[in-house]
Amino acid sequence: LKQSYHEFYRIYGTDTYEDKVSPETIITEDSNSGYQFFEHVCIENGLKCESMNGKSNVFHYLNKHKGEKILVIADGAAFGSEIDRVLQVIHGRKNVALYLPESFEWMIMDADILKNNTVRSILSNPSEYVESKLYFSWERFFTAILIEQTKDTYLAYAKRKLNPAYLSGAIKESILRKMNIIDLNKKDE
C-alpha cells in the first residue's frame, strides 16, 4: 500500500461535484500568500473573500453563514484535524464546497508555471524527497521547495507577501485552471 500525498485536492461537500462550483464567498484558512492570491481574484470578479486566520475558525464561520454559497480553500496538508467537524457542519448543505490542495505553494508548482523538471519530479512523488526531520509539515516542505526554486527569479516566492507576478494574467490563469470545476469568473448581474 502506497500513500499518495498530492491527491487531496478534490472538492468535498454534501455531494460529489460534477457541475461547476460557483461560490459567492471564498474563505481561506490562512492570511498569507494564498489568501492574498484569492482576495485579488475575488476583487476582480466581484466575490467576497475572507481569511479565517487559522483552520479552527473555518468551522465557526460556516456555522454562522449558513445561507451563503461558500468555497472553503484550506491546505489539505494541515486541515486534517478540522475535517470531521467541518464535514459535520456542512452535512446536508449544497451551498458549501471544500477545496483542499496540499498547500497554496503546491498549487503554484502543480500549475507548472516554473517549467522545472526537479519540481515535476518532487510533485510526482514527494515522499521520496521530504526529510521529516527538517519539515514539520507538507506545507513547509512545499514552501521551502518553491522558495528555493524561484529565488533570484522574477517569480521569487515569499510566504508572507505574495509576489505580484503571481497575480498577472497567464500565471494567475494557470493556477486557477488547476481548480477544474470551480468557477470564480465574474457573475452576471
What residue ranges belong to the model's regions?
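Charge-biased C-terminal accessory regions appended to nucleic-acid-, cytoskeletal NTPase
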Residues: 127-189
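Generic serine detector
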Residues: 4, 22, 31-33, 51, ...
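Sequence-level detector for tyrosine residue identity
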Residues: 5, 9-12, 17, 35, ...
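Hydrophobic, Leu/Ile/Phe/Ala-enriched alpha-helical segments that form helix-helix packing faces
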Residues: 38-42, 87-90, 179
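Activity-critical C-terminal alpha-helical subdomain
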Residues: 73-153
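RecA-like P-loop NTPase motor core
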Residues: 1-81
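Context-gated lysine
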Residues: 2, 20, 48, 55, ...
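Acidic-enriched, low-complexity/disordered segments with a strong bias for Aspartate over Glutamate
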Residues: 15, 19, 30, 75, ...
